[in-house]
Amino acid sequence: MRSFLYGVLAFAVLARSSAVAAFPIPDESRPLSKTSPDTVAPRSLRIEAQEVIQSGRGDGYGGFWKNVAQSTNKIVKRPDIKIGKLIEAAKKAKAKMTKS
């Protein structure tokens, strides 16, 4: 039983030392996975409300993207609302409600 314990202990020490030798510095492997924004290739991922429109048969083109829904990224001009006028109108309406 004691020899089995020594064998397991030796295996654990060897496994740990080989794992440590594989990555001696924990942050050493990270620079390979990190990329700067200027080197990242632009990605063309399909987003919601897009579909592939097939081109003619046998012409060698696989298709192109068509935007099915209208874009929601448009800037919408908000109406100019005078808060003071709204408060005055609310006070007048409240006064009418209390009189009747």
Curated annotation (Swiss-Prot):
This is RxLR effector protein Avrblb2. A motif (RxLR-dEER) lies at residues 43-57. The RxLR-dEER motif acts to carry the protein into the host cell cytoplasm through binding to cell surface phosphatidylinositol-3-phosphate. The motif is not required for perception by defense protein Rpi-blb2. The 8 residues at the C-terminus (residues 93 to 100) are required for the correct subcellular location at the cell periphery or around haustoria, the ability to enhance P.infestans growth, the association with C14 protease, and apoplastic C14 accumulation. Residues 1-22 form the signal peptide. The Avrblb2 protein of Phytophthora infestans is a polymorphic member of the RXLR class of secreted effectors. Especially, the polymorphic amino acid at position 69 is critical for activation of Rpi-blb2 hypersensitivity. The Avrblb2 homologs that are recognized by Rpi-blb2 have 'Val-69', 'Ala-69', or 'Ile-69', whereas the those that are not recognized have 'Phe-69'. GO terms for cellular component: extracellular region; host cell plasma membrane; membrane. Its main location: secreted. It is found in: Secreted; Host cell membrane. Secreted effector that acts as an elicitor of hypersensitive response (HR) specifically on plants carrying defense protein Rpi-blb2. Enhances P.infestans colonization of Nicotiana benthamiana leaves. Interacts with, and subsequently prevents secretion into the apoplast of the host papain-like cysteine protease C14, thus promoting virulence by interfering with the execution of host defenses. Associates with calmodulin at the host plasma membrane to interfere with plant defense-associated calcium signaling in hosts. A motif (Calmodulin-binding motif) lies at residues 78-82.
